[in-house]
Amino acid sequence: MSNTDSVRVKLLFFAKSRELAGVSGTDDFLVPHAEIKCSELLDLICNRYNLSIIRNNVILAHNEQYCADLSETIRIRNGDELAVIPPISGG
């Protein structure tokens, strides 16, 4: 794949992921390939934003749809929205 396959997406963080990342999100997270496995995408995000400590406890969402199977390959387009959602507890 060439560099022209990369896409820019909106990235949102919630709860603990926001706290660890130090930002609520960004409008220009660069994904290196338009087609990518959810697990690879989550690894990219966790490595870039120091979220490795919660990597195994978060849910990745793509355009408000949970990526239930991290081995699934998804297609990302410019302007898509990704969200990192940690477990939420409360009463």
UniProtKB/Swiss-Prot annotation:
Modified residues (Glycyl adenylate): 91
Pfam family, one: ThiS
Record pathway: Cofactor biosynthesis; molybdopterin biosynthesis
GO MF term set: molybdopterin synthase activity; nucleotide binding
Predominant localisation class: cytoplasm
InterPro entries reported for this sequence: Beta-grasp_dom_sf, MOCS2A, MOCS2A_euk, Mopterin_synth/thiamin_S_b, ThiS/MoaD-like
Subcellular location as annotated: Cytoplasm
Any single biological process term in GO: Mo-molybdopterin cofactor biosynthetic process
Keywords tagged on the record: Cytoplasm, Molybdenum cofactor biosynthesis, Nucleotide-binding, Phosphoprotein
Matches recorded under CDD domains: Ubl_MoaD
GO cellular component: cytosol; molybdopterin adenylyltransferase complex; molybdopterin synthase complex
Superkingdom, taxonomy of origin: Eukaryota
Modification type 1-thioglycine: residues: 91
PTM info: C-terminal thiocarboxylation occurs in 2 steps, it is first acyl-adenylated (-COAMP) via the hesA/moeB/thiF part of MOCS3, then thiocarboxylated (-COSH) via the rhodanese domain of MOCS3.
HAMAP family found in the cross-reference section: MOCS2A
UniProt miscellaneous comment: This protein is produced by a bicistronic gene which also produces the large subunit (MOCS2B).
Function: Acts as a sulfur carrier required for molybdopterin biosynthesis. Component of the molybdopterin synthase complex that catalyzes the conversion of precursor Z into molybdopterin by mediating the incorporation of 2 sulfur atoms into precursor Z to generate a dithiolene group. In the complex, serves as sulfur donor by being thiocarboxylated (-COSH) at its C-terminus by MOCS3. After interaction with MOCS2B, the sulfur is then transferred to precursor Z to form molybdopterin.
Record note on quaternary structure: Heterotetramer; composed of 2 small (MOCS2A) and 2 large (MOCS2B) subunits.
Family, as annotated: Belongs to the MoaD family. MOCS2A subfamily.
Protein name per the record: Molybdopterin synthase sulfur carrier subunit
